[in-house]
């Protein structure tokens, strides 16, 4: 009798995605981040659900409801900090996952890559709205500053901002709708993950060598299930170390002050995982220009496949491109640092240089490096 997992309509889907899936035999730990992201998403939905049971999305009670969760709800503090730091782990895994795609040329799987970009935007929107919910100073002013960017849209900008606010400033209506969106978007993301995997399984995974692995496949289970479980355990270990020993390490102390529209914090800044984009936004002295640069800093990923000039897929055997890739990583770390600094000399100049370098590497230097490497190999 044929195994039920290969026959049952539902079990068959799971079987073909997680058990009998033919996987390349040489994929490294950089291929672990996909499953780690799934773990992060599941953790965030679970902890978020329990937080939503005790949270109230009203300007008068939001801040105290979060305090109530931490003080009075059984294990409320651990749920709250797992959710807050879980977001940080989520973004670490996201950036590693995208970095892997850039390094090994996974962006040649166009549909998977583009769905991934949409997913990235969805999760960034979710995280931004989640940061507003505790209704601390940084929540309120972060929401005010970021939503205000839409006023740079010609002609309809002001109307657009007021429509999103549900009034003439960030207030009760804004908080309520942000909570609604923050609750629903992770489920939208889950659906997109399914589509992401659907497209990935049409072509099969890429591998470090960049060469087709059709002739050398191994079953996903047990080889990669055990590897993914190890990765997940390490992820949870790091998350719990963060939660137990320094839960506020990555947060902003200003968010422990209740939101006050009459007092602006000295430095308004988003969570650390948005600082690189925030630095690019601030480095352009024009409002509309800054907003466009902010959008392009992520949207540039969509044109990466069109800029691929090398005749090799990944960067494994391309030292010039490798150098540029790690220069890009260093540049992004520099931008992250600058985003958290006040707007004054020399940070402004460093931010502008780092922003120019970011776009130059991706749009100009990497395609040129590909051509040079082809030439060196006489291809």
From Swiss-Prot:
Swiss-Prot/TrEMBL GO biological process terms: mitochondrial electron transport, ubiquinol to cytochrome c
Entry keyword set: Electron transport, Heme, Iron, Membrane, Metal-binding, Mitochondrion, Mitochondrion inner membrane, Respiratory chain, Transmembrane, Transmembrane helix, Transport, Ubiquinone
Which top-level group of life is the source organism from? Eukaryota
Cofactor(s) in the UniProt record? heme b
Q: How is the cofactor bound?
A: Binds 2 heme b groups non-covalently.
Query: What stretches pass through the bilayer?
Result: 33-53, 77-98, 113-133, 178-198, 226-246, 288-308, 320-340, 347-367
Q: Where does a ubiquinone bind?
A: 201
Keyword match Transmembrane? yes
A Gene Ontology molecular function term for this protein is:
ubiquinol-cytochrome-c reductase activity
Note the Gene3D superfamilies from the entry.
Cytochrome Bc1 Complex, Chain C (1.20.810.10)
Indicate how the chain sits in the lipid bilayer: Multi-pass membrane protein
The places in or outside the cell where this protein is found are: Mitochondrion inner membrane
Amino acids binding heme b b562: 83, 182
InterPro entries xref list: Cyt_b/b6_C, Cyt_b/b6_C_sf, Cyt_b/b6_N, Cytb/b6-like_sf, Cytochrome_b, Cytochrome_b_C_euk/bac, Cytochrome_b_N_euk/bac, Di-haem_cyt_TM
List of residues binding heme b b566: 97, 196
Q: Which GO terms describe its cellular component?
A: mitochondrial inner membrane; respiratory chain complex III
One Pfam annotation reads Cytochrome_B
**CDD domains referenced in this protein's UniProt entry, alphabetically:** cytochrome_b_C, Cytochrome_b_N
The further comment given in this record reads: Heme 1 (or BL or b562) is low-potential and absorbs at about 562 nm, and heme 2 (or BH or b566) is high-potential and absorbs at about 566 nm.
Q: How does it assemble?
A: The cytochrome bc1 complex contains 11 subunits: 3 respiratory subunits (MT-CYB, CYC1 and UQCRFS1), 2 core proteins (UQCRC1 and UQCRC2) and 6 low-molecular weight proteins (UQCRH/QCR6, UQCRB/QCR7, UQCRQ/QCR8, UQCR10/QCR9, UQCR11/QCR10 and a cleavage product of UQCRFS1). This cytochrome bc1 complex then forms a dimer.
Biological function = Component of the ubiquinol-cytochrome c reductase complex (complex III or cytochrome b-c1 complex) that is part of the mitochondrial respiratory chain. The b-c1 complex mediates electron transfer from ubiquinol to cytochrome c. Contributes to the generation of a proton gradient across the mitochondrial membrane that is then used for ATP synthesis.
Q: State the similarity comment.
A: Belongs to the cytochrome b family.
What is the name attached to this protein's record?
A: Cytochrome b
Q: Supply the gene name.
A: MT-CYB
């Amino acid at each position: 009798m044929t195994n039920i997992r290969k026959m049952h309509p539902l079990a068959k889907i799971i079987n073909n995605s997680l058990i009998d899936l033919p996987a390349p035999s040489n994929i490294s730990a950089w291929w672990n981040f996909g499953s780690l992201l799934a773990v992060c998403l599941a953790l965030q939905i679970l902890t978020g659900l329990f937080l939503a049971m005790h949270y109230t999305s009203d300007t008068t009670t939001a801040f105290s409801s979060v305090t109530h969760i931490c003080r009075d709800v059984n294990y409320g503090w651990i749920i709250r900090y797992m959710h807050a730091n879980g977001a940080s782990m989520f973004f670490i895994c996201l950036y590693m996952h995208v970095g892997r795609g850039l390094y090994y040329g996974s962006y040649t799987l166009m549909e998977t890559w583009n769905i991934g970009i949409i997913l990235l935007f969805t999760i960034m929107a979710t995280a931004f709205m989640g940061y507003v919910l505790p209704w601390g100073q940084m929540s309120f002013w972060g929401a005010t500053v970021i939503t205000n960017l839409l006023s740079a849209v010609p002609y309809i900008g002001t109307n657009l901002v007021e429509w999103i606010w549900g009034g003439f400033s960030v207030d009760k209506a804004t908080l309520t709708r942000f909570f609604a969106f923050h609750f629903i978007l992770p489920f939208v993301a889950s659906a997109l993950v399914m589509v992401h995997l659907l497209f990935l399984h049409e072509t099969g995974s890429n591998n470090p060598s960049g060469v087709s692995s059709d002739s050398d496949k191994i079953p996903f289970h047990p080889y990669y299930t055990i590897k993914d479980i190890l990765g997940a355990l390490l992820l949870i270990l790091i998350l719990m170390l963060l939660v137990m020993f320094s839960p506020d390490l990555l947060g902003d102390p200003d968010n422990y002050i209740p939101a006050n529209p009459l007092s602006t914090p000295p430095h308004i800044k988003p969570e650390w995982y948005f600082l690189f984009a925030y630095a690019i936004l601030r480095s352009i002295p024009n409002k509309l220009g800054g907003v466009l640069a902010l959008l392009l800093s992520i949207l540039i990923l969509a044109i990466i496949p069109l800029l691929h000039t090398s005749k090799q897929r990944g960067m494994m055997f391309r030292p010039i491109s490798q150098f540029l890739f790690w220069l890009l990583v260093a540049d992004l770390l520099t931008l992250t640092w600058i985003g958290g600094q006040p707007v004054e000399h020399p940070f402004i100049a460093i931010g502008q240089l780092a922003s120019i370098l970011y776009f130059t590497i991706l749009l100009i230097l990497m395609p040129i490096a590909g051509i040079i490497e082809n030439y060196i190999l006489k291809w």
